[in-house]
Amino acid sequence: MRPMTFIVGLKTLWILAFSSLSNTLAVNNSGRWWGVVNVVTSTNLLTDTKNVQLVLDPSLQLLSRKQRKLIRQNPGILHSINSGLQSAMKECKWQFRSRRWNCPTTGGDNIFGKIVNKGCRETAFIFAITSAGVTHSVARSCSEGSIESCTCDYRRRGPGGTDWHWGGCSDNIDFGRVFGREFVDSSERGRDLRYLMNRHNNEAGRMTVFSEMKQECKCHGMSGSCAVRTCWMRLPTFRAVGDFLKDRFDGASRVIYGNKGSNRASRVQTHHLEPENPTHKPPSPQDLVYFEKSPNFCTYNGKTGTSGTSGRVCNSSSLGLDGCELLCCGRGYRTKTQRVTERCHCTFHWCCHVSCLNCTNTQVLHECL
């Protein structure tokens, strides 16, 4: 009996260990494609020959087979992906510049750190903004002629209104959304709560870019009378996308894993997200969702990869999140002065140069203890 008990116990431990490893790999694989931001050169004049390996840079080894195939099928698109990811990183840092979590990044493969291993609000924003970055950049690159497989969106043609008509070069948001969905979502594996959360937030980012598209027009007529206008659809600024997603971050929905039961007859997907609080309405496609409480980000935590707020500059006169009381988590702050030299009293001289003086000012800084 004892040998049999030992074997059963050993088998149980092996299954648990394998399950834990699988979950860890699933978490880490979700954002592996972010590593393309470290690509030294974003040119991707890649052959379509099966015998030639699609790895011109070590960072591309982080991509799945499907993602590498998509890059090979769309020459020029790797530069667009890289640019979109760069924009997403900058926007994330700007939106959270005054928060305890200020969207820190690293130079390694996992550029956003260990926080993405948690199902919290911050992870939701990271997935949404990076997905939006790819869609936005690819759609813009199509209209600029930077990608061989797409062009402007010319579907809108002919009369549009009483004094205007469709024309010009609309940004190709449809190609950006389709490519973004195939490229970004292909890194998600499984059918668990984290999978549903990441897929939902990825789509929320793409939907935000689409919903914020604006109509632009150019006037035609004698002396600028604007008797007739030619109009096209233009992408929003990425700052507008970031502002929208930041609002969704503040109002994010906490969700649980919902399962209506199997339905073999209709083959309908029964797994879905439900609000943790049954009195709340289900999240909309543009809402951000999370399932785990965020760390407080006040002190260093190696498990979550948070560095704390010690040494951060705070605003002593603010009662908001950037104020010293909240940002420093009640630990207090130190005040110091520093001398800063800046260019000032600049004058333009015809033609063509600008002359400036150097002005030295004293700045007062408050840093969290």
Curated annotation (Swiss-Prot):
Locations listed in the record: Secreted, Extracellular space, Extracellular matrix; Secreted
GO molecular-function term, one example from the UniProt record: cytokine activity
Positions glycosylated per UniProt: 28, 315, 358
Keyword Cytoplasm: no
Entry comment on modification after translation: Palmitoleoylation is required for efficient binding to frizzled receptors. Palmitoleoylation is necessary for proper trafficking to cell surface. Depalmitoleoylated by NOTUM, leading to inhibit Wnt signaling pathway.
GO cellular component: extracellular space
Any Pfam family the entry gives: wnt
Residues covalently joined to lipid (O-palmitoleoyl serine): 223
Cysteines engaged in disulfide bonds, as pairs: 92-103, 142-150, 152-169, 217-231, 219-226, 298-329, 314-324, 328-368, 344-359, 346-356, 351-352
Swiss-Prot/TrEMBL GO biological process terms: canonical Wnt signaling pathway; cell fate commitment; neuron differentiation
UniProt xrefs under PROSITE patterns: WNT1
Family statement: Belongs to the Wnt family.
Protein name: Protein Wnt-1
Organism name: Ambystoma mexicanum (Axolotl)
Gene: WNT-1
